[in-house]
Amino acid sequence: MPSLDHFGIIAPYYDRTIPLKAPQHLIELIGLPIEGAILDAGGGTGRVAQAFEHLATRVVVVDLSIGMLRQARQKGGLWPVCSETESLPFPDASFERIVMVDALHHVLSQKRTVNELWRVLKSGGRIVIEEPDVRKLSVKFVALFEKIALMRSHFIAPPEIIAMFAHLNAMTQIKLDGFNAWVIVDKN
């Protein structure tokens, strides 16, 4: 039975109802500006990626929702690509930076996604994953709502995200700020 395309339904309203907060903080965590390409994995409408448009040579937005990517295309300056994050259509070492904001809990296989992000990251590159910190009570309510709404979400704590990178010999760190956590992964 096909699942409901929640994101396709909300795509035209997404940017207005969920605006990007504090892009400067994310820009600093990612380490911008750079010469090279940035991948916004699970980037939907490109609301995050548009903050990087003039800070890199190319900004690619990957998402599975055609409705969300239509919104990204309207922004201009972004390269929207329809794909699962578990099987990215890019050669190895394609990106200097990768960001995944509020999306890891929506993918079917977090482990495969992590491995794919690592595969397409260049040596010397950085991945920043921003996720709601499921250890917080308010996030537990969000997780419950998404489960009731049949949104295939699977929230995991920041240390569990870090553990998925352990076999890759990645340099990792966690930054916390209330509702969100940022997992920062560097590839030597």
What residues fall within each predicted segment?
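Conserved class I S-adenosyl-L-methionine
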Residues: 1-33, 47, 68-71, 142-145
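C-terminal alpha-helical "lid/dimerization" subdomain adjacent to the S-adenosyl-L-methionine
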Residues: 17-18, 48, 128-183
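Short glycine-centered segments of the SAM/dcSAM-binding site in methyltransferase folds
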Residues: 37, 124-126
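Class I SAM-dependent methyltransferase SAM/SAH-binding core
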Residues: 39-41, 45-87
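A conserved beta-strand element that flanks and buttresses the S-adenosyl-L-methionine
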Residues: 99
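Short catalytic micro-motifs in class I SAM-dependent methyltransferases
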Residues: 102-103
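A short glycine-rich, Lys/Arg-flanked "PGG" loop and its adjoining helix->strand segment in the class I
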Residues: 111-123
